[in-house]
Design a protein with these regions (language model features):
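Membrane-interface helix-loop-helix junctions at boundaries between adjacent transmembrane segments
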Residues: 10-16, 20-25, 29-99
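Hydrophobic membrane-targeting alpha-helices
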Residues: 4, 28, 76-81, 198, ...
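Interfacial loop-to-helix transition and helix-capping segments at the boundaries
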Residues: 62, 116-126, 173-184
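Membrane-interface helix-boundary motifs at transmembrane edges
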Residues: 4-11, 84-92, 141-154, 198-205
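Extended, charged low-complexity segments
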Residues: 145-267
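Hydrophobic cores of alpha-helical transmembrane segments in multi-pass inner/ER membrane proteins
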Residues: 1, 62-79, 126-143, 185-195, ...
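Loop-centered beta-sheet repeat module
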Residues: 86-138
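Membrane-anchoring/interfacial helices and their immediately flanking loops
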Residues: 30, 39-62, 134-167, 171, ...
């Protein structure tokens, strides 16, 4: 997805769409958790918001989750920590072919063996159409113009942390309330859109802190929760990864101080 993003003209809306494509492909087409009412991770979301054979709230949540955590934020972290690779494709023809082939092969294996559930044909076909539509929109999206307004320049780390917590809270707590599923879906989507909108309004340093704040929720409190639930070593891995990101970022800033540097904003 990162290679397509660079080749198609960057922009954070485009990155969001490509991340969403990945989420739809993984959860909808490969794992089929969009449709399986008994998928192991669903919990309440196997019934809350299940419409026409689709776990709609789960589908929205996992699309947002993968768009951010599986695609967009890793891409932005790499660009921040290794600025010399920014705007440069990392794979050429053979590398792209190997990556695409590996993803397709692993996807087929998981489709067949990970979850034997057979999704409804019409809904599954429409999900394939959705993937094509999102790819087309991402491909032909107009190149964004530079932004002049400012984003969350004060305490971007805390802002990112707050958005991550609120997204998690909305999609884990609200299904236990009397709120209609459509409200839960829309709240999460609006928060994700607002988060993406901030990325293009910040300088490089503030953008990284915003991203790190979002990631910190999953690396520290969430991983500690997983540790308490029996996932041995998860807390140590999360905290260590967070500290390593901080150390690497400090090294980058020391080599190329960003204080007073020109603001690099995109949308």
């Amino acid at each position: 997805m990162r290679e397509l993003w660079v080749r198609w003209g960057r922009g954070y809306l485009r990155l969001m769409l490509l991340g969403a494509v990945y989420g739809v492909v993984e959860e909808g087409l490969i794992i089929k958790s969009w449709f399986d009412p008994h998928w192991k991770d669903l919990g309440m979301l196997g019934t809350y918001g299940r419409v026409w054979g689709v776990n709609t709230v789960w589908a929205a949540w996992l699309t947002i989750f993968h768009s951010l955590l599986s695609v967009s934020l890793p891409v932005l972290v790499v660009e921040a920590l290794y600025p010399s690779y920014k705007n440069k494709p990392l794979l050429e023809g053979r590398g792209l072919a190997v990556a695409a082939g590996s993803f397709t092969l692993s996807g087929l294996v998981m489709f067949i063996f990970l979850n034997p559930y057979r999704p409804p044909l019409v809904q599954y076909t429409l999900t394939i159409v959705l993937v094509g539509f999102l790819l087309a929109v991402a491909r032909y999206l107009r190149k964004p113009s530079p932004k002049t307004s400012k984003g969350q320049t004060q305490h971007p780390f805390l802002y990112g942390l707050a958005v991550a917590f609120l997204l998690f809270f909305v999609y884990t707590a609200f299904p236990h309330s009397s709120l209609p599923p459509v409200v839960t879906i829309l709240l999460g989507v609006l928060m994700a859109l607002y988060f993406y909108s901030q990325l293009g309004l910040l300088d490089d340093s503030s953008r990284f802190l915003l991203v790190l704040g979002f990631l910190s929720f999953w690396m520290i409190p969430y991983d500690i929760l997983l540790e308490l639930k029996g996932v041995t070593g998860e807390a140590a891995v999360g905290i260590t990864a967070f500290l390593l990101l901080l150390l690497r970022w400090r090294s980058v800033v020391q080599k190329s101080p960003l204080e007073g540097a020109p603001v690099n904003r995109e949308s």
